């Protein structure tokens, strides 16, 4: 399942904006094995629209009928740093993001990953799902 959420302050109907930008967001594989150390996320942007992004990427496990963050193995060294932003001079056709999973307990189940981008005051939230067997 891939979802794209596009938010622009003060604008309720963003269907026209979604038509103007075509972004594909996909996990490298649909199914991973237990204790996979990393996953790669690819975002293709076949437009010349520059997108800003930070280090943030959210990872969730489907548990008890809701999406929950997975349990971390050791939280004593965890540093959260996602307030920075990057903008590349020319819009690349393909972005690749690597997400380390070896810090988490990754049991079998259904997962989703989210990555946010922005363009001025507009925010794009991309989501994709995968499975661990």
Question: What are these regions, as identified by a protein language model?
Answer:
Residues 73-110, 116-120:
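Short, solvent-exposed, Trp/other aromatic-anchored flexible loops in extracytoplasmic proteins
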Residues 1-79, 116-133:
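Primarily secretory-pathway and cell-envelope proteins
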């Amino acid at each position: 399942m891939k979802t794209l959420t596009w938010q622009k302050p003060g604008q309720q109907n963003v269907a026209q904006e979604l038509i103007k930008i075509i972004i594909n967001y996909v996990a490298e594989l649909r199914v991973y094995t237990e204790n996979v150390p990393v996953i790669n996320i690819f975002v293709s942007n076949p437009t010349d629209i520059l997108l800003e992004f930070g280090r943030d990427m959210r990872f969730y496990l489907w548990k008890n009928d809701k999406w929950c963050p997975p349990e971390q193995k050791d939280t004593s060294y965890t540093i959260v740093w996602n307030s920075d932003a990057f903008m590349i001079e020319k819009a690349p056709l393909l972005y690749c993001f690597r997400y380390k999973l070896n810090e988490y307990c990754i049991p079998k189940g259904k997962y989703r990953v989210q990555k946010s981008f922005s363009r001025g005051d507009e925010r794009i939230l991309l989501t994709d799902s995968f499975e661990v067997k």
